[in-house]
Amino acid sequence: MDALKILLLFLLPVVFSSCKEKLDPHSVVETNRRQIERTELDDWIHANLVTPYNVEVQYRWNKNTAGKGTYVYPPKLEKVKDVLEAVCELGFELYTNPELGGENFLKGRSSLRIVLYGGGNPDNNGVELLYNPQTSAAEISLYNVNDFDPKKAETLYVLLRSFHHQMAKRLMELMPYERDAFLKISEARYTRGSTDLIAPPLGSYTTPKEKFGLNGWANMRGFYTMLSFLSAEDDFAEIVSTTLVSSPQEINDAAKRAATPEDADEPDPDPSVHQRYAKEAEQAHKEFTEKQKFVDAYIKKEWHIDFLRMQLMSVRRIDIYLKNH
C-alpha cells in the first residue's frame, strides 16, 4: 500500500502538468479563435434591433453562412448601419406602428437573424434572387449592401422589396395561410423554383425596378412580378412585398394590364387567335385579383392589419425617408 501511495504521489504532478498543457491559453485552438471586440455599431444594433425586436444581425464575414454554389462576399463596414437604419425605420417600425400591428406585433415570436452581403445573389441563370433559398424563413438575407445609397430611390426599393418579401415568408410561417387554396389559383403556372422561364425576359432588363418591380409580362399571366412564378410561397410574398413599395394606382394599373389581351394594340386578324387572347386575359385578371383579395383577407384575419392602410403608410414613409436624405 505504501508503494502504491508513493506511485500516486509521483504521478499526480504529471497528470496536472498534462491538464495544464491542454488548457494552455496559447494552444493552437485558442490562437485560432478571433477575439471580436464589441463596437459602437454592435451597441447600436443591440439597442435598435436585438432589444426591441429580438433580431440578431450578422455583418461580420462567415463563409459558412453562404450556401453552396453561391458567389457572395462581405459587406463594407461603412454601409452596414445605413442599411440597418433603413430596415428599422421602413421595415420593423412599419409593422409595429400603433395604427397597424402595434408595438407587441413581433414580441413573443421566435427570433430573426439578418445576414448582410456585399453583392447580389444571382442563380445559375443569372437571375437575381431577393432571398437565400437555402436558408429557413427565420433568416433574412440582405444583398447588394455595398451598393446601397439612402439617397437613391432604386437601391432603397430593392432593399425594401427583399426585406418585405422575406418578412412576409416568416410571418406566413408563424401565422399560416391556407396554402392549398392559394396554390390552386395559379397552380399550373408555377415553375417549382426554376428560373428557366423568367431568365430570358429578365436578361433584357437593366434597372432594379425593371428586374424586381411590377411587370407587364407577369401581369398578363396573373402575377405581380417575374419572381412570383417560382412558387406559391414566392407569389404570396411578392404580392405583400410589391404592394408595400407601390402606390395603389400602380397596383391598379398592374391589374388593368392583367385584363389586357396580348393583341390589344393590334387585334389579330384570325378570330380564333383574337378570342384566345381575350380568354387568356380574362383568366389572368381573374387570378391576379383573386390572389390579391386572398392576401388582403389573410393579413386582415391573421395580422389584424388593414393592408391598404399599411400600404399607404409604407409609401408615405418611404417618400419622407428619401426627402430627409
Predicted feature residues:
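Surface-exposed patches in mature extracellular/periplasmic domains of secreted proteins
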Residues: 93-118, 174-183, 250-260, 303-314
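Metalloprotease/metallohydrolase-associated module, dominated by Zn2+-dependent proteases
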Residues: 191-293, 297, 303, 308, ...
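Sec-dependent signal peptide recognition
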Residues: 2-9
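Auxiliary, metal-adjacent structural segments of Zn-dependent hydrolase domains
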Residues: 81-139
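C-terminal motif of bacterial Sec signal peptides marking the signal peptidase cleavage site
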Residues: 14-18
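Second-shell loop/turn segments in exported
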Residues: 69-78, 145-158, 222-230, 281
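Active-site recognition of the HExxH zinc-binding catalytic motif
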Residues: 153-181, 237
